């Protein structure tokens, strides 16, 4: 089946060229309200766009062998994660039991005796084990869970259980697009409210500019996310091909709203997601964070309490920007921060919090523990 987002590639470059010329003229005329294009930023966005096209093909081959119930190494992955979790739990217990105040930063502060020496030795071993084992348990569990979820919730797989066939007519097409839009709203919202999913999505928010090239700055690690499955549409009677069409329509719509060249659009702002609404979504201004998650329709945000108008000038990017245009850094910085936080944790509530709770919680927890903040913040 033809991927509409790939067919549109020539149009992407044509419209980016037109936008570049338009914003350049405005800036040369003294209008600093638009940021326009910057070479390294644009190249980074294009590189991430290419990566997002290649990643699904590569990940499918890489992850298939370790998918539980499907790959030869799936069982080994699960056993490794469970074993690492057991080691981590044991190390946590040792660290709690040996926390007697006779060490400061690993340096003895009391005279040695046999019992103290045994405790110190056990504590040193536990410290060496708890980080690597915790990371192995969490990473292995995430890979096992996400690969299993992805393979069991595809549109083609769920289509086998459908009870009706809505066909491919105009009503079915419109229905599929609207249903996809509704599911997209929740998936997009969850990507901002769970740090595990935010680590995937943060790529799209990492630019400090806002133009059509930003729309192409897409994640490459979707394979490690567990989302509300759009395959559910197949259970409702939408054919898998129609579900894919709905995906393409939604993604194409989102392309044109990544621009500063278009102002507010009157009454359309009440129903549709517009450039103005989506500029808010990309803002790091406190009142703009985690707002306007809709794809085509803004009504979901109005209904579920996440709507915000564009009232003041938007500051694009993250609350703490990564200061890098390197694609690898853009793609992995938040994952690296999560694993580092897990490695430095000594209890499961903290580990799970750093992975699954919101990005803001991680900042609060670091502050409570008087630790440095992660490299990149929320958007």
Where in this protein do the model-derived segments appear?
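Hydrophobic alpha-helical transmembrane segments
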Residues: 5-9, 46, 78, 170-175, ...
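Alpha-helical transmembrane segments of multi-pass membrane proteins
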Residues: 10-25, 56, 60
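Hydrophobic core of alpha-helical transmembrane segments in multi-pass integral membrane proteins
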Residues: 13-17, 54, 79-92, 135-148
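Membrane-interface helix-loop junction between the first two transmembrane segments
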Residues: 17-43
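Alpha-helical transmembrane segments in multi-pass membrane proteins
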Residues: 37-56, 69-79, 119-139
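Membrane-embedded catalytic scaffold of the fatty acid hydroxylase/desaturase
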Residues: 56, 87-88, 92-100, 104, ...
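Long, highly hydrophobic alpha-helical transmembrane signal-anchor segments
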Residues: 57-68, 135-168
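Cytosolic-facing loops and C-terminal tails of multi-pass membrane proteins
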Residues: 313-379
């Amino acid at each position: 089946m033809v991927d509409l987002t790939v067919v549109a590639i020539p149009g992407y470059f044509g419209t980016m060229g037109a936008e570049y010329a338009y914003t350049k003229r405005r800036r040369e005329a003294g209008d600093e309200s638009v940021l326009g294009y910057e070479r390294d930023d644009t190249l980074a966005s294009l590189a991430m766009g290419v990566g997002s096209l290649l990643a699904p093909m590569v990940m499918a081959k890489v992850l298939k062998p370790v998918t539980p119930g499907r790959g030869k190494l799936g069982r080994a992955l699960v056993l490794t994660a469970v074993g690492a979790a057991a080691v981590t739990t044991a190390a946590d217990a040792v660290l709690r039991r040996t926390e007697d105040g006779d060490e400061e930063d690993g340096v003895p502060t009391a005279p040695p005796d046999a019992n103290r020496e045994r405790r110190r030795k056990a504590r040193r071993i536990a410290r060496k084990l708890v980080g690597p084992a915790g990371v192995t348990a969490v990473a292995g569990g995430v890979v096992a869970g996400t690969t299993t979820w992805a393979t069991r919730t595809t549109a083609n797989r769920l289509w086998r259980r459908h009870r009706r066939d809505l066909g491919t007519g105009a009503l079915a097409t419109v229905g599929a697009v609207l249903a996809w839009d509704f599911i997209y709203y929740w998936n997009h919202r969850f990507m901002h409210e769970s740090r595990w999913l935010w680590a995937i999505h943060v790529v799209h928010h990492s630019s400090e500019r806002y133009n059509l090239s930003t729309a192409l700055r897409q994640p490459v690690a979707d394979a490690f996310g567990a989302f509300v499955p759009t395959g559910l549409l197949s259970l409702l009677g939408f054919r898998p091909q129609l579900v894919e069409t709905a995906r393409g329509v939604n993604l194409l719509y989102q392309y044109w709203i990544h621009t500063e060249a278009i102002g507010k659009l009157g009454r359309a702002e009440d129903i549709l997601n517009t450039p103005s609404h989506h500029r808010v979504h990309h803002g790091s201004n406190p009142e703009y964070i985690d707002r306007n998650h809709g794809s085509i329709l803004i009504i979901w945000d109005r209904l579920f309490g996440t709507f915000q108008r564009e009232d003041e000038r938007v500051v694009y990017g993250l609350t703490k920007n990564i200061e890098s245009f390197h694609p690898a850094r853009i793609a992995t910085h938040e994952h690296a921060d999560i694993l580092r936080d897990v490695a430095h944790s000594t209890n499961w509530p903290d580990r799970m919090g750093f992975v699954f709770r919101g990005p803001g919680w991680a900042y609060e927890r670091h502050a409570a523990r008087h630790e440095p903040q992660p490299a990149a913040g929320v958007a």
